[in-house]
């Protein structure tokens, strides 16, 4: 095979000469440039070797063949460190290893914070409240820094160790045949060998530690909710201890307990919650109310302050108290089995959306529509808060209410269904 024939199939100038055996394995076809000049001839590719010749090819031969089959010409390719083992190369290797190890450290920190950091809300008592408030920021900080550190390490490795290469490829169509798969594997193997990662034990170990810790922390963070038993009865109620998901601040702790519908005052120089009477609301209005007991106090003592904080922070506590206009009462449709849950013109629905637990906090007075701004679910307050638009599939849970002997609005029992989004064990629809 002549050098002219070798040039005709586009051998990259960096590949060098070939043995007679190699020349016999790759049989050239017509020159692609001639086909382009003629305009009538299709672009030709090298004739493919048979299976025996393909199996006998070395990785470098497969690499060269793959380039020619794909119409790839390597214009430039040089290693980053022509001389191995220099001090500069070692410094570059250590800098990459540092970033990868940092990724592992932050990934391990994410795992430890998720497992052991105090995440449950407790009433403010100085230092413990501050530690609790750091839980979510620390999740995001350690997760983000772990990803960032590994990414910086990967980018630095590419810039400092992967050979510099400029390749030019002609556009063409082709299917993934056996020969294509073998040559692609050869290219990947060449890239792996050229990256010199095999002999860089420190970087390999650092990468393994970084990705391992990051992956473990991420896996535990996502699977943690599936590992913990959510049905452990820990909340004392009038019917015995129950799991957290079955309860809220409106759940009576003993038979006959009075739980008032209280509005938040938003002031610091007075009680944070005050009881409500029917005359405190205008017709058509909406008020957010919270569960308040006489034993919760007015916040003047440390114990009372803690209890009131728990009321305000309870995720299933906020309730929308809506007063229907007398002229619109005839349009009200009550839910089956809940016909007595309202007190005259007053209806109380949870503020926790039945879609994903977001706060459905917007209310349109003229149409009696309740809107969750997160995913645009809408509920009709005239039709037992049934969803009429958006992804929510269930009505908002309704709280039974009445009035006590002193004329204050009180809960007439607990929610008869879980508050918020669905879960597997839920049977109500």
Swiss-Prot record:
Cofactor details (free text): Binds 1 [2Fe-2S] cluster per subunit.
GO molecular function, one term: metal ion binding
Region (Disordered) location: 1-45
Cofactor(s) demanded: [2Fe-2S] cluster
Rieske domain span: 316-410
Pfam families hit by this protein: QcrA_N, Rieske
Keywords: 2Fe-2S, Cell membrane, Disulfide bond, Electron transport, Iron, Iron-sulfur, Membrane, Metal-binding, Oxidoreductase, Respiratory chain, Transmembrane, Transmembrane helix, Transport
Localisation per UniProt entry: Cell membrane
Main location: membrane
Membrane topology category: Multi-pass membrane protein
Residue pairs linked by disulfide bridges in the UniProt entry: 358-374
Domain of life of the organism encoding this protein: Bacteria
GO cellular component: peptidoglycan-based cell wall; plasma membrane
Spans through the membrane: 96-116, 137-157, 207-227
Binding site for [2Fe-2S] cluster: 353, 355, 372, 375
Reported function: Iron-sulfur subunit of the cytochrome bc1 complex, an essential component of the respiratory electron transport chain required for ATP synthesis. The bc1 complex catalyzes the oxidation of menaquinol and the reduction of cytochrome c in the respiratory chain. The bc1 complex operates through a Q-cycle mechanism that couples electron transfer to generation of the proton gradient that drives ATP synthesis.
Further information: Was identified as a high-confidence drug target.
Subunit structure, as described in the record: The cytochrome bc1 complex is composed of a cytochrome b (QcrB), the Rieske iron-sulfur protein (QcrA) and a diheme cytochrome c (QcrC) subunit.
Listed name of the protein: Cytochrome bc1 complex Rieske iron-sulfur subunit
């Amino acid at each position: 095979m002549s050098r002219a024939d070798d040039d005709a199939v586009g051998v990259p100038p960096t590949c060098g000469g070939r043995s007679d055996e190699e020349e016999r394995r790759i049989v050239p076809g017509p020159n692609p440039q001639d086909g382009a000049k003629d305009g009538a001839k299709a672009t030709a590719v090298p004739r493919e070797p048979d299976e025996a010749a393909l199996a006998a090819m070395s990785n470098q031969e497969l690499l060269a063949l793959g380039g020619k089959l794909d119409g790839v010409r390597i214009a430039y390719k040089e290693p980053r460190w022509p001389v191995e083992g220099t001090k500069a190369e070692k410094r570059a290797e250590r800098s990459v290893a540092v970033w990868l190890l940092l990724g592992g450290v932050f990934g391990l920190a994410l795992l430890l914070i998720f497992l052991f950091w105090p995440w449950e809300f407790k009433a403010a008592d100085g230092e413990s409240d501050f530690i609790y408030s750091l839980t979510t920021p620390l999740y995001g900080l350690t997760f983000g820094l772990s990803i960032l550190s590994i990414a910086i390490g990967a980018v630095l490795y590419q810039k400092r160790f992967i050979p510099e290469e400029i390749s030019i490829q002609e556009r063409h169509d082709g299917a993934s045949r056996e020969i294509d798969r073998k040559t692609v594997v050869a290219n990947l193997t060449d890239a792996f060998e050229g990256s010199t990662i095999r002999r860089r034990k420190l970087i390999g170990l650092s990468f393994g530690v970084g990705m391992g810790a990051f992956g473990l922390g991420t896996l535990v963070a996502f699977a943690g909710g599936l590992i913990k038993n959510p049905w452990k009865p820990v909340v004392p109620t009038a019917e015995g201890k129950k799991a957290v998901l079955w309860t809220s601040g409106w759940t009576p702790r003993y038979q006959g307990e009075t739980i008032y519908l209280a509005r938040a005052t938003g002031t610091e120089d007075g009680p944070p919650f005050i009881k409500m009477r029917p005359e405190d609301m205008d017709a058509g209005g909406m008020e957010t109310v919270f569960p308040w007991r006489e034993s919760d106090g007015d916040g003047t003592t440390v114990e009372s302050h803690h209890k009131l904080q728990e009321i305000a922070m309870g995720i299933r506590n906020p309730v929308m108290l809506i007063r229907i206009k007398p002229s619109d009462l005839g349009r009200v449709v009550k839910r089956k089995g809940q016909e007595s849950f309202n007190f005259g013109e007053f209806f109380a629905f949870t503020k926790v959306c039945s879609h994903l637990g977001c706060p459905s906090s917007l209310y349109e007075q003229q149409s009696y529509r309740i809107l969750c701004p997160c995913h645009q679910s809408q509920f009709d307050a005239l039709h037992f808060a049934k969803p009429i638009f958006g992804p929510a599939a269930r009505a908002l849970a309704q709280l039974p209410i009445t009035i006590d002997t002193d004329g204050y609005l009180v809960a007439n029992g607990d929610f008869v269904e879980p508050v918020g989004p669905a879960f597997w064990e839920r049977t109500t629809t």
